Amino acid sequence: MPTNRTSVSSGSDFEAAVGYSRAVRVGPHVAVAGTTGAGPAGDIAAQARDALRRIEIALQQAGAALTDVVRTRLYVTDISRWREVAEVHAQAFGQIRPVATMVEVSALIAPELLVEIEADAYVEP
């Protein structure tokens, strides 16, 4: 394992059960795992907003910020609702404008989850 590797935990039981970290930083690169969010039942925008809030916390714990994000991947269970998620993404990233991919998936780990987001960041050395 690289000596300049930092792992970030959110404390989720899933991390130990699955064997992953919320985020990992190696040198200037930070990868944040697929992150879901909470919100009122069926509110995909609220879930996206909360997922991005959790991603921001993980980035901060790894010594990065939303302004360092260069790529996001968004997984939604209903692509017809893409605009709701896109609006939240645009609000969070403003002029940062990382490259992004959004795809529809058949399901996430729990049936009430509607969106999951990954982020990659690069921190200037």
Regions found by a protein language model. Give the residues of each.
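Short, polar/acidic, helix-capping and beta-turn segments at strand->helix junctions
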Residues: 1-125
